[in-house]
C-alpha cells in the first residue's frame, strides 16, 4: 500500500491523493488512487 504522500493525482490539491474525499498528506491510502471511498490510515 503506497504512502499517501507518495501518490500524486493531478487535479487534487497539492497533487496529493484523496482519502475519504479529502486530500491526504500523511498515512496510507487503502486504494492507491485515493478514491472518494478510500481511507487514510
From Swiss-Prot:
rRNA-binding recorded as keyword: no
Family recorded in the similarity comment: Belongs to the ornatin family.
Renumbered ranges of motif Cell attachment site: 33-35
Protein purpose: Potent inhibitor of fibrinogen interaction with platelet receptors expressed on glycoprotein IIb-IIIa complex. May prevent blood from clotting during either feeding and/or storage of ingested blood.
GO biological process: cell adhesion; regulation of blood coagulation
Protein name, as recorded: Ornatin-A2
Record bears the keyword Flavoprotein: no
GO cellular component, one term: extracellular region
Signal peptide per UniProt: none
Compartments (UniProt record): Secreted
UniProtKB keywords: Cell adhesion, Secreted
